[in-house]
Amino acid sequence: MSRDKELEKTLVKNADKNSITNAENTEAAAPIIPWASPGSTTAPVAEPAAKSAAERAELAASSVATAEKAAKEEVAEETTKELAKPARRSFFDRIPGMRSGALWAHLLFILVALYAFDYVTHAAADDIYVYRLGAVSLADGPDGYQLYTFRTRGLPFTYPPFAALLFYPLAFLTEPQSMLLITAIICALSYWCAYLLYSYARSRSWRLPLQKHLGHWGMVSLIAALIWMCGPWRLTTHFGQINAIILALILADFMRPATRVPRGVLLGIAAGIKLTPLAFGLLLLMRKDWKGIATLGASFAATVGIGFLVIREESLTFWFHAVHDTSRVGWFSYFDNVSIMGTLTHAGLQHHLTATALSVVQVALTLLIVLVTAVLLVPLIRARALMAQLALTAFMMLQISPISWSHHNTWYPLMLAAVVMEIFPLMYQRVSSFVFTLAVILATAALVGMYISPFWIVLAFSPHFNADQILMVPEGSLGLMAGTMPYQLMYLFILVTFFVYLANRQLVERAAHAADAELAEAKYSR
């Protein structure tokens, strides 16, 4: 600013000097006319000279203004250039996906992964050892272990023969190597699941917290770390379970376009590994995807056929004997059983009801959750709320199975996304404050409890038992019932949502049609 003022003063001084000099020169050059009177000697010339001086002064002032304007424009241009210069980037900013904000998210995921790999090298992981020994039994033949009779760490092989064939490569690995392999797979799938969730959210124009600061890959790393730290994924890693693989197969089948390969192929393979994914046939049925249902049946039948073709004796044993023996999986009242049967036995109802009466209650609650799920799928399908469709069907699957351990619920991230971003916006647009508050309390308590896991909840509500004594917590106690309370609260939340839908059916249907039209328009505009 000081430079501008000095320039301005200099221009004004020069202009004043020029105008004075021009005036003096004009007066000196005025001619003297001999025959004119003395009083009028300079009169005829003075008026034009004064006029000329005024014009020149005006011209000088105009040039000063022009110079000032040019100087200001030059300064403004220099300032703009300075501002337009890109800020100096740090080393991490030059790496794709490593913005300074995202760096912390990447580091968090790396720390979670390092902790997981360090943990599994020092802690027991029973399930992966069962898978490995199942593969060893096939490799050793009739003279070695028998697939459905051996036990390792007290646990038998409970999966179909097709699963044992897929586990066959584990026979060439040691127990620690197999554990590290399954942990690496879980690590990759947690990141892939986070990528799918974030991409799905962006395609629906959802704004997520910290999205502006972390960027795309920073958000993916943060979501992946949070997924891996939740109760179901922690325990899946602890046991070396295949639940993340089952999730990946089903997600890949439903999130891909069903073009050349019809939907249902991967779902059938998942059911061939573990029977419970057959429950997703209800989703195909409510979509009226007859081709998908046929493909699911054919794919599942192919896995059964491969089992009979390769290991006939083991297949006969499983399909005609082992599949009916639920005691091979565990006992119903185990603290980690989150199914309907687990809820009933945790409450100790088996001691107050006959076996028949207990079965009637279980069947009634099973039919209720199946009916409610089928009804709620209608508006969710119409609104193309895919996360909610998958999450609701997965919850039904966990509930109707006689035994569902909490680590089977690797669907938790989808449940959280579905409740917050699809079910509430679609179903709870115009409800009373009481109903809305009730739904928020039920959903929040359920989702927070699922994240923690039954193990820690049981210990929190059982002050006289420690971790080594958790199996001694008695049936019917508050501590044992509290462990699976989050799943009971989610069941109640779904029932409340069901009645809200029935009471506001037309409004929900209009909202579903609007959501469908908006997604169709967005897809067309792309």
Residue ranges with predicted function:
Residues P262-L285, T393-I400:
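Membrane-interface alpha helices of multi-pass inner-membrane proteins
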Residues M1-F91, N504-R526:
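Short, intrinsically disordered terminal tails adjacent to the first/last structured region
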Residues T174, L189, K274-P277, M415:
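Hydrophobic transmembrane alpha-helices
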Residues W405-E422:
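Hydrophobic/aromatic-rich transmembrane helices and adjacent perimembrane loops
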Residues V420-R526:
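Aromatic-enriched
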